[in-house]
From Swiss-Prot:
Protein name: Undecaprenyl-diphosphatase
Chain's role: Catalyzes the dephosphorylation of undecaprenyl diphosphate (UPP). Confers resistance to bacitracin.
Transmembrane segments: 13-35, 45-62, 82-102, 108-128, 186-206, 219-239, 250-270
Chief location of this protein within or outside the cell: membrane
HAMAP family (UniProt xref): Undec_diphosphatase (MF_01006)
Further facts: Bacitracin is thought to be involved in the inhibition of peptidoglycan synthesis by sequestering undecaprenyl diphosphate, thereby reducing the pool of lipid carrier available.
Catalytic reaction annotation: di-trans,octa-cis-undecaprenyl diphosphate + H2O = di-trans,octa-cis-undecaprenyl phosphate + phosphate + H(+)
GO biological process: cell wall organization; peptidoglycan biosynthetic process; peptidoglycan metabolic process; regulation of cell shape; response to antibiotic
Keyword Cell wall biogenesis/degradation attributed: yes
Keyword entries, A-Z: Antibiotic resistance, Cell inner membrane, Cell membrane, Cell shape, Cell wall biogenesis/degradation, Hydrolase, Membrane, Peptidoglycan synthesis, Transmembrane, Transmembrane helix
Compartments reported by the entry: Cell inner membrane
Gene: uppP
Length: 273
């Protein structure tokens, strides 16, 4: 394998892992960064691999929690509610994605839409943080979430179908807006990422498996490992961060990044293939 291609695959995996769980839109970062470094994968298999690497970072970080849930399923009330809440939160975006995913990609997957959603999302985060600073959150533990709370987070996740919104951003801010404490909303967003991303990965594999070749294995493994490691770092770092601080820095970053996308696009530095 060419060293430069390997390096680019490594960098793309790192970008996916670092941005997937932050409220800053991993999709926007992958497209912009891929254009800037000249990395153009021939098919979806590489993207599927790095997404899977990122989601497995959450499974690894919370392996004890998931193990307890699996062993307690059907017997333990907390485990049953946890799975029920994930299922409820999963459904809205899954249904809307199946119904309108093709149209969303056709009409909204462009620099202007992504940039606008990044900027609007940044201002939305500022508003939610200001609102929560004035009110005491009602729910401060994932195990205290009710099915109605999970449903509201699931409804918020529907907005993440629009490129540039950020899945983690929509679920975390949706949870906080509903009265869930910042760290609790963040953790539930991590947990919800597992069924959402596994389902999306399985769907993409069924659609694109025929494009897989043994020639791609090396790059796929490099991207997968990079996404797993960087995803693990991002999850740990974000949990520490939100234990003491708020999401306002990410809001400003989104606004600046959204404006930067427009500038890069208009100047011809990035394309949107």
């Amino acid at each position: 394998m060419d060293f430069l291609i390997v390096l680019k695959a490594l960098m793309m995996g790192l970008v996916e892992g670092f941005t997937e769980f932050l409220p800053i839109s991993s999709t926007g970062h992958l497209i912009v960064f891929g254009n800037l470094i000249g990395f153009h994968s021939n098919h979806k298999v590489f993207e599927i691999a790095i997404q899977l690497g990122a989601v497995l970072a959450v499974v690894f970080e919370y392996r004890q929690r998931f193990s307890n849930v699996l062993h307690g399923l059907g017997k333990d009330r907390k485990a049953n509610r946890f799975v029920l809440n994930l299922a409820i939160a999963f459904i809205p975006a899954a249904v809307m994605g199946l119904l309108f995913g093709k149209q969303i990609k056709e009409y909204l997957f462009n620099p202007l839409s992504v940039a606008v959603m990044l900027v609007l999302g940044g201002f939305f985060i500022l508003w939610v943080e200001k609102r929560q600073s004035r009110a005491e959150p009602k729910i401060a533990d994932v195990d205290a979430l009710r099915p109605i709370d999970a449903l509201m987070i699931g409804v918020a996740q529907v907005f993440a179908l629009v490129p540039g919104t950020s899945r983690s951003g929509s679920t975390i801010m949706g949870g906080m807006l509903w009265g869930i404490e910042r760290k609790t909303a963040t953790e539930f967003s991590f947990f919800l990422a597992v069924p959402m991303m596994v389902a999306a990965t399985a769907y993409d594999v069924l659609k694109h498996y025929r494009f897989f070749t043994l020639h791609d294995v090396g790059l796929i493994l490099i991207g997968f490992i990079a996404a797993f490691v960087s995803g693990l770092v991002a999850v740990k770092a974000l949990l520490r961060f939100v234990s003491k601080k708020n999401y306002i820095p990410f809001a400003y970053y989104r606004i600046v990044f959204g404006i930067a996308i427009i500038i890069l696009w208009l100047s011809g530095w990035i394309s949107w293939e």
